A protein has these predicted regions:
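C-terminal scaffold of the Radical SAM
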Residues: 1-183
Length: 183
């Protein structure tokens, strides 16, 4: 999975990304040449100063590169993040709605189908990992801050490395935010 986010270098800079479109394209090509036959590219809509035209261009450029999978996420501003503290010029709700609709239209024209809210794939290339979340397949996270779903229990491991490093062998000692799923 390669995180392009946008094909507009100005948008990338506003996001704090350290790559340009040309560098992303080079990385994508290097992945292909290394033998990766199933690539995902992440894109983001609703970015600062982004408009429908630049979003459509991003979709068309990336779809034209023919990755097997495209994740098209909408930017969500979270409290406590640098973006939340800035006054940003973001697309309004109507423009974001049009971006979402155009995502489906453009990617469908390139042979992708939508199988989740934000995910599009070529036939047979849907991400099994993503589908597992929707079908409640069990998964185990290992390491600091990792998430798991196991035996109808959802939980997160400690985020503090010093405490996690003192693990005593009892899994319960490092699990937090436990939630039992009943439906």
């Amino acid at each position: 999975s390669l995180g392009c986010q946008s094909t507009d270098d100005t948008e990338l800079k506003l996001l704090g990304r350290i790559h340009t479109l040309a560098q992303f394209q080079e990385s994508f090509q290097m992945a292909r040449e290394a033998g990766f036959a199933n690539l995902n590219v992440d894109l983001m809509s609703g970015l600062p100063r982004q408009n429908l035209t630049s979003w459509e261009k991003s979709l068309e450029v990336i779809a034209g590169m023919e990755p097997e999978h495209i994740s098209a996420y909408s930017l969500i501003i979270e409290e406590g993040t640098p973006f939340a503290e800035k006054k940003l010029e973001l697309p309004d709700e109507e423009e974001e709605r049009r971006m979402y609709e155009r995502t489906w239209e453009i990617l469908q024209a390139y042979g992708y189908h939508q199988y989740e809210i934000s995910n599009y794939a070529k036939k047979g290339k849907e991400c099994r990992h993503n589908l597992g979340y929707w079908t409640r397949k069990e998964y185990l996270g290992f390491g600091v801050g990792s998430a798991s779903l196991f035996q109808n229990q959802r939980f997160i491991n400690l985020r503090d490395l010093s405490v996690y490093g003192a693990f005593n062998g009892n899994p319960e000692s490092i699990r937090r935010d436990r939630e039992t799923l009943t439906v």
